[in-house]
Regions:
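N-terminal secretory signal peptides that target proteins for export/translocation
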Residues: 1-6
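Bacterial N-terminal signal peptides
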Residues: 9-21
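C-terminal and late-domain segments of enzyme folds
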Residues: 27-59, 70, 74-79, 84-92, ...
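Portal/gating segments that form or line small-molecule/metal binding sites
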Residues: 72-115, 128
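Catalytic-core regions built around general acid/base machinery
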Residues: 112-115, 135-149
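Catalytic nucleophile loop
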Residues: 120-123, 142-166
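Glycine/threonine-rich flexible loop motifs
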Residues: 126-136
Length: 294
């Protein structure tokens, strides 16, 4: 463990000295302040919840849970989505839920966000989150939470909503990648996020999105796995893999995505991946070359 921490300190020292700063002046993709925890669904790894609570300020920090992606009309303090947080020791949990945009635009409804240090989006269908909260006072409150250094996390649909482009946002089925809802909350700009990546054999699905919108960065997160975003850098934690879909880069001849493992880092601004070793050289097989036409 000591060797790992020493290597981690070395990694960040070299990375920051090379100009990959985490400060707001360098931001183009990630949040200028605060953190994001983006989980690919099937959350069982205690480390992920613990990291979220740590970034919020500890188990006594006020946390708002938003279960609106789910299919139920009503949620309360006994909602199943709170169980993992209670088991992790969280003591101040508030449920925030509505399907009424007028209510989402009311000061009374938004009030819990003003005191929160963390917000968590549960799973379900991401278009429900967009319908209720996109471009409302709730959306403004979420941005304000990040600006004061808070953390926003989410799993499954709660992961996808954090990107600027909303994949699987069709109200008819979640198999349509570019549907009738295409705008997310944009905590990550110019990014499309997919989830349940390998568990549901979705590893090829983001290709059509990035081919249609070649400036977008596609990020696919498998179950029980997360990316933790600070500024324009993220780290992979959990038990499986994260896939990167970057139209300007390919893996070997024609490969349209590549995988990051737990412990790997990624610079969202430069679109370079790093493995925690005694250097910060990008992955050797990834070539800066546009995808071939099909």
């Amino acid at each position: 463990m000591r060797g790992y921490r020493t290597g981690l300190r070395f990694f960040w020292t070299v990375l920051l000295s090379a100009g990959f700063t985490v400060g707001a002046h360098a931001q183009e993709v990630g949040p200028a302040s605060g953190s994001l925890v983006i989980v690919g669904g099937g959350l069982r790894d205690e480390e992920i919840i613990e990291r979220f609570l740590q970034l919020a300020g500890g188990p006594d920090a006020p946390i708002v849970v938003i279960p609106t992606a789910g299919s139920s009309e009503r949620y309360d303090q006994y909602s199943p989505g709170l169980r993992q947080f209670r088991e992790a020791g969280a003591t101040q949990l508030t449920v925030l839920h509505t399907r009424d945009r007028d209510e989402a635009n009311s000061d009374a409804f938004v009030a819990p966000l003003r005191e929160a240090r963390g917000v968590w989006f549960g799973g379900g269908r991401q278009w429900r989150l967009a319908d209720s909260y996109l471009n409302t006072k709730v959306h403004e409150g979420l941005r304000a939470l990040l600006e004061r250094g808070g953390v926003i996390g989410g799993t499954s649909a709660g992961a996808t909503i954090q990107g600027s482009y909303l994949v699987r946002g069709d109200t008819r089925t979640n198999t349509i990648m570019m549907g009738d809802h295409e705008e997310g909350l944009a905590f990550l700009r110019n990014v499309a996020i997919d989830q349940h990546l390998l568990k549901r054999n979705r590893q090829f699905d983001l290709i059509e999105v990035v081919e249609a919108h070649s400036d977008l960065l596609g990020i696919g997160v498998d179950e029980n796995t997360a990316i933790v975003v600070r500024g324009d850098m993220f780290e992979v934690i959990g038990q499986s893999y994260v896939a990167i879909y970057d139209h300007s880069r390919q893996l070997g001849p024609g490969g349209r995505y590549y995988l990051l493992a737990p412990g790997d880092r990624y610079n969202l601004r430069t679109r370079q991946a790093y493995r925690l070793t005694m250097s910060v050289e990008p992955f050797e097989r990834i070539k800066q070359e546009p995808w071939p036409e099909r």
